[in-house]
């Protein structure tokens, strides 16, 4: 029997896996890598390059090298998110005849699923080379927060690549399958925090033993389909470009070639700073002007990078709160936290997740491979190789139709287990109305126009009657892929009309490149290098906290205090650019002393606020000291056990 493969089609990287016996196997590509860059390039010789070969030539061919296509999938050209993307990428995004966002390469317009299909074809070939037989079927993963259009476009991409897509499953759910398949049976609730190359998802999943089956039930899901590693790269690119402009007066945004080199360097620096405290961004001959060639050389510390992406990491917390609320759970009821997606390797992300959930995330799940492994497990369930696993996924967004007054009437609420079916009876708004338009919507807003329009169709030849008399039965049917079929029927005549929601946008991939560690040969040089890196890190950290505090206390500082701190910050920034350790230490001390009074004020302010809050809750604390004590102890206990 032919194998069904599991594919993680990511924004940045893709991965393919297959079940061998009772073990999932991640398959290496022809270059020997377990993940493949989700990049497609078109050369002047009419050759199509996919993966590493496309990535290697991106600097010399930026306008015909397509990356992060997944961020365009199922989106209209006029979507503000697409407009933002246009400014971020060197290739051309244009408006298709149907209003969707497509790409233009070598005077040809291509839909995103066509580009994504090239990556899927590479994954298919990788699996076929390993298995020694043709592969025709696949399970493909998508972000949990993908809407109906985006899911349909993913299926289209599979079809273009010559694959029958047996099932579309959500990435966090796939990761939960990968984590839970070989764990001991028993009930537990896990949070899957998935921050990939272009999208963010959080899913709360209950793993339980039900009638001898290992049941994975998604309780709630939330996310942001335009937040990921690409945004972290962009924040760093903007910083590097602005620093270069300060030094030279040249804006690198006007040079696609330089911008592509900057993107590669930013991605590399970001990865290095997950394991190192400091790195050098060194790009010789980045550009030139009348005076000659220009070189970019900027020292970057982990603290500086963290200050640049702090707000992006904070954006992931609100969806976590919403998912917990929708699941009807508190943080203390989560047993384990799983991290998925290459961007979760960043220490700041791990720290933020640990602080929010009150427990250390598990380290035994490979963030780059877990999703593909889960897809392979689901593929084995569909083919009958694995028999005792039941997966209950949900629809991430509410579905409904537009009714009188421009209101969205929901037929299926968000976080409803799929497959599911819902029927509701509506009537006409005017006397003698002979046709109704069914406008299908997806989203959470009351106002119809504020939600995503999935499509519309007309039910005609309704017998004339006073308003409110005809009975039109509207049925929403969501299949196991999360794809919607809508039908409407006039109960009097039996006349019916239906629509399968179709999208004509497309996508690409997700996942992150491997880390590079620089080994130094001489121990003494290592020691000096580390000391300087830590010192710069300390300086950047202090600068960031001082600048933040000055904003918070702007009204409470005297002009002299402000001037003193600003001067100290400026001098320390200048010292950090050099290599004189003593000078950095001196300027660090000056800023520390200058900000001491400000720190005392913050402490005093927080202390007085804390005392006020304590006074308000004192009576509550006295009534339930035991319960609160137990919760605290439980947090500590879980942490300790995790560490063992």
From Swiss-Prot:
Belongs to the heat shock protein 70 family. Keywords: ATP-binding, Chaperone, Nucleotide-binding, Phosphoprotein, Stress response. The modification Phosphothreonine is found at residue 199. Residues 605-644 are annotated as: Disordered. It comes from the Bacteria. HAMAP family: DnaK. This is Chaperone protein DnaK. Induction: By stress conditions e.g. heat shock. GO terms for molecular function: ATP binding; ATP-dependent protein folding chaperone; unfolded protein binding.
